[in-house]
Amino acid sequence: MIGRLRGILAYKQPPWLVIDVGGVGYELEAPMSTFYDLPDVGRDVILFTHYAQKEDSVSLYGFLREGERRLFRDVQKVTGIGAKIALAVLSGVSVDEFARLITSGDITALTRIPGIGKKTAERMVVELRDRAADFSSGAPITGQLGPDAVSEATVALQQLGYKPAEAARMARDAGAEGDEVATVIRKALQAALR
């Protein structure tokens, strides 16, 4: 329903933040991994979102990186895990670290994440191992000029068929402070042809 929001960061106090989009304040819940990289209040921000509706509530979750949102959704597909534990996972470890823990089957490290016991960790390893390679943190989406161009170029490169991690690396390597999105994309594609 709501896949992405771009607006002014009006409020941030973990785990809640508010983004003003055209005069409407969207309240979102976000993991600490998102809070670490948020710009200051009053600055532009772009967040990937996940909309969840239950019988008695509607929730909106925000993530700076597409890989975080993807992981949030995949973790909730594991039997017995909901949004609260999925947020705890993203607040406790990076997407890349989580993928490593799942791939290696490190049950002990997974149980250090709040809300995850041994049986849940074992279920996570079994149910997510095949998808762990697809997890990628990607580049953060922010409203600042340089990073914004790099982030938007990352999304564009993904739409051209590049994997999220590869697209993020290409855009980051090609981008310079103040570059336009088209410039970053052009430089990234030229570098890929060399």
UniProtKB/Swiss-Prot annotation:
GO biological process: DNA recombination; DNA repair
Domain II: annotated segments: 65-140
Chain spans, region Domain III: 145-194
Region (Flexible linker): 140-144
A Pfam family this chain is assigned to: RuvA_C
One GO molecular-function entry: four-way junction helicase activity
Cellular component per GO, a single term: cytoplasm
Region named Domain I: 1-64
InterPro entries given in the database record: DNA_helicase_Holl-junc_RuvA_I, Hlx-hairpin-Hlx_DNA-bd_motif, NA-bd_OB-fold, RuvA, RuvA_2-like, RuvA_C, RuvA_C_sf
Record's subcellular location: Cytoplasm
Similarity-based family: Belongs to the RuvA family.
Free-text domain note: Has three domains with a flexible linker between the domains II and III and assumes an 'L' shape. Domain III is highly mobile and contacts RuvB.
Complex and partners: Homotetramer. Forms an RuvA(8)-RuvB(12)-Holliday junction (HJ) complex. HJ DNA is sandwiched between 2 RuvA tetramers; dsDNA enters through RuvA and exits via RuvB. An RuvB hexamer assembles on each DNA strand where it exits the tetramer. Each RuvB hexamer is contacted by two RuvA subunits (via domain III) on 2 adjacent RuvB subunits; this complex drives branch migration. In the full resolvosome a probable DNA-RuvA(4)-RuvB(12)-RuvC(2) complex forms which resolves the HJ.
Role summary: The RuvA-RuvB-RuvC complex processes Holliday junction (HJ) DNA during genetic recombination and DNA repair, while the RuvA-RuvB complex plays an important role in the rescue of blocked DNA replication forks via replication fork reversal (RFR). RuvA specifically binds to HJ cruciform DNA, conferring on it an open structure. The RuvB hexamer acts as an ATP-dependent pump, pulling dsDNA into and through the RuvAB complex. HJ branch migration allows RuvC to scan DNA until it finds its consensus sequence, where it cleaves and resolves the cruciform DNA.
Cited NCBIfam families: ruvA (TIGR00084)
Protein name stated in the entry: Holliday junction branch migration complex subunit RuvA
